Amino acid sequence: MTTITEELIARLKQGIISGVDLQPRQVNVGTVIAVGDGVARLSGLDQVVASEIVEFPPKAGRNESIYGIALNLEQDSVAAIILGDDESIEEGDLVTSTGRVISVPVGQGLLGRVVNPLGQPIDGKGPIQYEKMRPIERIAPGVITRKSVDTPVQTGIIAIDALIPIGRGQRELIIGDRQTGKTAVAIDTIINQKGQGMVCIYVAIGQRRAQVAQVVGTLEKYGAMEYTIVVSATASESAALQYIAPYAGCAMGEEIMENGVMLNGQLVKDALIVYDDLSKHAVAYRQVSLLLRRPPGREAYPGDVFYLHSRLLERAARLNEEYGGGSLTALPVIETQANDVSAYIPTNVISITDGQIYLEADLFNAGQRPALNVGISVSRVGSAAQTRAMRAVAGKLKGELAQFRDLAAFAQFASDLDATTKAQIERGQRLQELLKQPQFQPLAVEDQVAVLYAATNNYLDDVPVAMITKWRDDFLAFLRTAHPEVRKLIYDNRLDRKFPTPEVKEALEAAIKEFKATSNYS
């Protein structure tokens, strides 16, 4: 039988006390006075600051803490949006302020993963290994730290790379009605970044879970997940999580822009982020604002809905060499209703971004895919974001397509056209056919240049309009197999100010003539 001695009691006391932190701590504690619809009204948190995280500690029936963000600071109460399920939070529950703002894990460990807006993995591949966290909200880089956009982001889509080029550090809006191929353009761009030294982030806001799973499956199929991070806030998530999702994705992108990650043994400091889509993001923020009883404005959106998107998109930048030379390129997506680009959210985002890719339902239904309306689409960075080779061949293309649009409109009302006008219209139709491209089949820059050179130098004038896409596919297959040296020559000289150099011109024209001599498309 063991006897309890004074020495044993002393040891027990020592053991218990040594495991307890007896230092005094000041904690700002309050209580929940009302909760519902993802919003909690709190009393007693007199030291909380705007956007601070508040914690609802574990209690009977709830083993984990639930967190929220304090957004409305009123005279006698604080309103906080709850990040997660609010069903276990009740009136009278304790709540504490944490002194922190919301942060997410960033860095190497996120590559190839699917996470929620809090940076927690949802792909079943285990915990994420990370070394640091970053606040999701941050002031955009200043004017002094930036550099002008001069390096292209090759989308692999010939119509975009030739007519509406996107540069590293640019914000290019993808806008159009539902089911016009907006996500397809973004996913094609991500797939084309393989081997280009670019990390991609895809932020899904308010989408169906099946749709997000389909996107992830597509990226895995084409080997793009190894350099991609997917941030998912689906339609089943709370409006609060949908609201913070793009900011979380942007913080992950900023880490890459500033400090870089290792990709295939190289340090990569260029990131591309897709926000799909900001229309649903604005709706989620409207829901949060109305629940917080903020006064509604136009279309019931709160007064700061412009600032909601401007502070997000301004964080995309190209840094100068003194600050690391990294870049964050943003491709926000906006869904319009019945082609109405003059609605509130579309006009807001158009005015914030550096151009827009406008996809039209009528063109999509007519078989023009990508359904790019060249007339309304624009890139404010322009040819500064193109290689010299693409600039040389695309310059003529823009003018000829503009001329074709004018003549096509005129031809609708004219019964008899002269031969020159007919030839110009047919030429425009050929060029338009050339810009059609199947999904998930991005073209390398040397292939785009070769095809556009042939088109703008009258080598396609004897090919029937219906055979143009077949001609393009066969010609590129011929170049890859019979003349890979021509493709290499174009790629090696793509930055030459005098493109096409006599050497490139001679080799390319010889290859085109050889192909025309061995094929028949009449």
Swiss-Prot record:
Belongs to the ATPase alpha/beta chains family. It comes from Chloroflexus aggregans (strain MD-66 / DSM 9485). InterPro entries: ATP_synth_asu-like_sf, ATP_synth_asu_C, ATP_synth_asu_C_sf, ATP_synth_F1_a_nt-bd_dom, ATP_synth_F1_asu, ATPase_a/bsu_AS, ATPase_F1/V1/A1_a/bsu_N, ATPase_F1/V1/A1_a/bsu_N_sf. The record marks 377 as: Required for activity. F-type ATPases have 2 components, CF(1) - the catalytic core - and CF(0) - the membrane proton channel. CF(1) has five subunits: alpha(3), beta(3), gamma(1), delta(1), epsilon(1). CF(0) has four main subunits: a, b, b' and c. GO terms for cellular component: plasma membrane; proton-transporting ATP synthase complex. This is ATP synthase subunit alpha. It is a peripheral membrane protein. It is an enzyme of class 7 (translocase). ATP binds at residues 176-183. Produces ATP from ADP in the presence of a proton gradient across the membrane. The alpha chain is a regulatory subunit. GO terms for molecular function: ADP binding; ATP binding; proton-transporting ATP synthase activity, rotational mechanism. CDD domains: ATP-synt_F1_alpha_C (cd18113), ATP-synt_F1_alpha_N (cd18116), F1-ATPase_alpha_CD (cd01132). It is found in: Cell membrane. The gene is atpA. HAMAP family: ATP_synth_alpha_bact. It catalyses: ATP + H2O + 4 H(+)(in) = ADP + phosphate + 5 H(+)(out). Its EC number is 7.1.2.2. Keywords: ATP synthesis, ATP-binding, Cell membrane, CF(1), Hydrogen ion transport, Ion transport, Membrane, Nucleotide-binding, Translocase, Transport. The keyword Ion transport applies.
